Amino acid sequence: MDRAPQRQHRASRELLAAKKTHTSQIEVIPCKICGDKSSGIHYGVITCEGCKGFFRRSQRCNAAYSCTRQQNCPIDRTSRNRCQHCRLQKCLALGMSRDAVKFGRMSKKQRDSLHAEVQKQLQQRQQQQQEPVVKTPPAGAQGADTLTYTLGLPDGQLPLGSSPDLPEASACPPGLLKASGSGPSYSNNLAKAGLNGASCHLEYSPERGKAEGRESFYSTGSQLTPDRCGLRFEEHRHPGLGELGQGPDSYGSPSFRSTPEAPYASLTEIEHLVQSVCKSYRETCQLRLEDLLRQRSNIFSREEVTGYQRKSMWEMWERCAHHLTEAIQYVVEFAKRLSGFMELCQNDQIVLLKAGAMEVVLVRMCRAYNADNRTVFFEGKYGGMELFRALGCSELISSIFDFSHSLSALHFSEDEIALYTALVLINAHRPGLQEKRKVEQLQYNLELAFHHHLCKTHRQSILAKLPPKGKLRSLCSQHVERLQIFQHLHPIVVQAAFPPLYKELFSTETESPVGLSK
C-alpha cells in the first residue's frame, strides 16, 4: 500500500520528463507565424512567445485590426509588429484557436508529421554547424543571459556579424569606426571635402584642450569657438559646427576630450558614418513612418477606450510590458548595426543597452505621437492618456506624453532621429563600463556625424532645444519606480507573465515568489 504513492509519483515525474522532451524537440522548429525561435505548441500551432502573446491579447479583447495596404503584408520576425491585421490573419490561417487541441491529443498522423519536421530541422542544424550561429533566448530565460542571447553573443565569443533575420549592415570606413583603447587607430589621412561651399578638415588636439583646462563641451554652457575647443579649420570655417556649445547635461555637443590619439577625421568618412547610422535605423524601425501617418485618423472610440479602462491593472501592465519589450528588441538590433558597437566587450554592450534602451524607445515614440490631438499609436489605433488609466500611474503616462509632445515640436526628420538615438545609446558616461575609452571614441564619431548632418541641412538650431539627459533619466526612473510598486502588489504576475528581457532590464527582483514553480 505504501509503494502505490511512490509509483504514482515516479510515473508523474516520468510523464513530466516526457512532455519536457517533446517540448524541447518541438522548439527546433521555427515559429510558423514569424520564423522566430519557437517555444512550443500554443493554441494549436508551433509559435514563439511573441506570437503566442499577440494571439492571446487579440482574443481577449476581440480586437478588430485593419490593414493600410492590401491585406497581404509579409509577416516575419522584423515585420510582425507592423501590421496586426495581417499577423492575426496568418495566425488564424495556420490554425491558431483558443479551442485548439494540445499535443497529447494529436492524431497519429499529426504526431508523425511533427516528428518528421523535427528530424528535418535537426538535420539542417547539423549541416550548419560550421556556420556562425546567432543564438536566441530560450523560453523563460532570465538574468543576463537574456540580453546576451538577444545580442547574439555566444559564450566567450564576440561575433561581429548581424542577425540573419535582418538585412546586412553597410560597411563604413575602418579608419573612422575603429574603436581602439590605445594607439592611433583612427584615420590619420587629411582629407579635404566640400560642404556647403566650404572646404575644410577637422583636427582635434587633446593636449591643447587639457592645457586650457577644459574637460569637454559638456563642461561649459557658453558658446565655443574652434580655437577654444581644439578644432582647427583650414581655408574656411565649417558653418556652425565650431559655434555649437551646450550645457553639461546635453546630448548636443561633441565631447572632444573623449577622443584618443586621433588627430583627423575626414568629412568623407563622417558622411559615410551618417549614411550607415541612418540605414541601420531604417532597417530596425518597428513601424514605418508612412504607416503611422496614414493611421492618424484611426482613433479609438469612446466605447473602446472604456474597454481598456475596465481592464485589470495586471492585464494592462502585461500588455504594455510585452509591447515595450518588442520595441526594445528593435533597439537591440539597431545597436548591433551601429558600426563599432559589436567590437565593444560584451559587458559594455550590455551596460549601454540596459541604461539606454528605454531612453531610445522614448525618443522613438515621438514618431507615433500625434501632437494635434495628443494621442499615441497603440495596438492598431491612436488613443490619448485616458487609454492607459488602468495602469494606475497617470503621472508617469502624463510625463511620457509631455516628453513626446516636446520632441514632436522639433519636427525631427527620420535621419535626425537615427543620429540622435545613436548618441543617446552610445554614452561613455554610463556607470559600469570596462573599456570606457572605446565607448568615448564611438561617441565622438557619432557626435561629429550628428553635427555634420545638422550643419549640412541647416538645422543646427535644434541642438539648443534637445531635452537634457536628465529628462530621459527621470522618465526611466519613474517607470522603474512604478514597476516596483506593481511588482510588490502582483509579484507572481511579473514573474510568470512578463517577458524575461523586460524583467532583466527593469525588475529589481529576479527570484521566484514562494510557491511559484519555474
Swiss-Prot record:
Expressing tissues: Isoform 1 is widely expressed in many tissues, including liver and adipose, and highly expressed in skeletal muscle. Isoform 2 is primarily expressed in immature thymocytes.
Subcellular location: Nucleus
Ranges of Basic and acidic residues composition bias in the record: 109-118
GO terms for biological process, alphabetical: adipose tissue development; cellular response to sterol; circadian regulation of gene expression; lymph node development; negative regulation of thymocyte apoptotic process; negative regulation of transcription by RNA polymerase II; Peyer's patch development; positive regulation of circadian rhythm
Residue intervals of every NR C4-type zinc finger in the record: 31-51, 67-91
Induction of synthesis: Up-regulated in the state of obesity.
Transmembrane helix keyword on record: no
Coiled coil: none
GO molecular function, one term: DNA-binding transcription factor activity
Family: Belongs to the nuclear hormone receptor family. NR1 subfamily.
Record's disease association: Immunodeficiency 42: An autosomal recessive primary immunodeficiency characterized by increased susceptibility to concomitant candidiasis and mycobacteriosis. Candidiasis is characterized by persistent and/or recurrent infections of the skin, nails and mucous membranes caused by organisms of the genus Candida. Mycobacteriosis is characterized by infections caused by moderately virulent mycobacterial species, such as Bacillus Calmette-Guerin (BCG) vaccine, environmental non-tuberculous mycobacteria, and by the more virulent Mycobacterium tuberculosis.
Comment text on domains: The AF-2 (activation function-2) motif is required for recruiting coregulators containing LXXLL motifs such as NCOA1 and NCOA2.
Designated name of the protein: Nuclear receptor ROR-gamma
The organism of origin for this protein: Homo sapiens
The organism's taxonomic lineage, starting at the top: Eukaryota, Metazoa, Chordata, Craniata, Vertebrata
